[in-house]
Amino acid sequence: MQLALTPEEADFRDELRTFYRDQIPAEIRERTRTASEANRDDIVATQKILNDHGLAVPNWPVEWGGKDWTPTQQQIWLDEMQLASVPEPLTFNTNMVGPVIAEFGSQAIKERFLAPTAALDIWWCQGFSEPEAGSDLASLRMTALRDGDTYLVNGQKTWTTLGQYADWIFCLVRTDPAAPKKQAGISFLLIEMNTPGITLRPIRLVDGSYEVNEVFFEDVRVPADQLVGEENQGWTYAKFLLGNERNGIAQVGRTKLRLAEIKELATANGLLGDPLFAARLAEAENDIVALELTQMRVASGSEGGKPNPASSVLKLRGSQLQQLATELLVEVAGPDALP
């Protein structure tokens, strides 16, 4: 595997750096750099800018707004976005439901949903997890039973991130409760959030804020033409989605920024002179380089748009390093880290 950028890739990187600096408002980038949570308006504004320049969904098929980029170019696009503190396109739209519709949806569903999904004219949320179906997702119980030209949907979804902003939710539903295997009988259904019978309840944190929700469905009627692909094939589509979701999830660029901030603060307050702290910071910097190389390997193994199962490692290790960076930042900030 080549570990250095080619001259052409370096030029591509520099073009993106210039674009992010000149086209994304500085105040949006500064809020993103310092904020602890997503700003809805900034996400929408940025994604519309990216979409207007053909840069919102490079991982999609070209005919639907994607780019004929190599995996390395796609990784550069994301890394430079993170390093510039640019809000990333909404992952529910760009990495989850969009690729599933593009790969498995009917022509009518593609024409109806893909363009507004790329432009963030539709804000999607994910309806997968249930109270008794989290890590064992195939145990989901929410049913969608065919009744003429509609599905009658009943059940509950939980941990629905940013569902309070969503216009639509893409759900895994059980369309054949009598299927012999729990992975069978599952379908992929698109549901408008303002459909009668849907109730959204926030799951609040101790400070009163929230970003995840419970969603209840009681006799919700969903048009049958909002089924993606074939009935009872939803588990196949879910595996495809989860593979795409993990690509780019390591947040290498943002962790690099956090480590640079830690080094700057530690230099200013003298903590970098502590050999133990300096060694821990150096180890974290080495670990992020190792993760970046793993990310490059995963990207280079994703030719042809096929998700790489090894991307699961990126989610795990990326989260560990984000947590480590936060712990180091709290330590270096001292009393200033208190709310």
Model-predicted segments: where are they?
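Intrinsic disorder at enzyme termini
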Residues: M1-R13, A337-P339
